[in-house]
Amino acid sequence: YYLLNKFDSTIIASNKILALEKADENVSEKASYYLAKSLLKNGNSGQAIEEFKKLTNAKNTEYASEAQYTLAEIQYNNIQLDEAEKIILEITSNPSSEFWLAKTFILWADIFKERGNKIQAKQTLQSIIDNYEGDQSIIDEAQNKLNEINNKQSQEQKLQEQKLQEQKEAVDEIIIENK
């Protein structure tokens, strides 16, 4: 159901599986995973957060890693940068998936940028571009975000140069008038 974007049906099916006493642990983790993702897609972030928290202890390290990343991302999206960074530090101290670790560093770069630390954001993104050897989409995402920061800095620099030029011209005009 989830892959068909039928999130309500996914929630119902996942809850039925989780209610079974004899459900296999792998099946239960998969049900919890899709339950959490569906709750989030449906805008029920409170319940989704609770499900993702449970998943951080999953034996399936991909589910656990994605759950931790998603918790950090939710905090970031809610402008809870300190909370997001706490989760990021937990992830980086005990990484279990290179993919989700790289995604975590990209999110961390977003936090640096949000806090005005563009140099650290750029260095973090460049490190991913230079060193990550996994999924190309991660490298592309890091490159796009780095380009975005560089383009914005370039625009800001051009505006600053334009203002300085206007000020210089105004001063020159005053000097010429006073001669």
Protein language model annotation of sequence segments:
Residues 1-179:
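Acidic, polar-rich low-complexity tracts and alpha-helical solenoid repeat scaffolds
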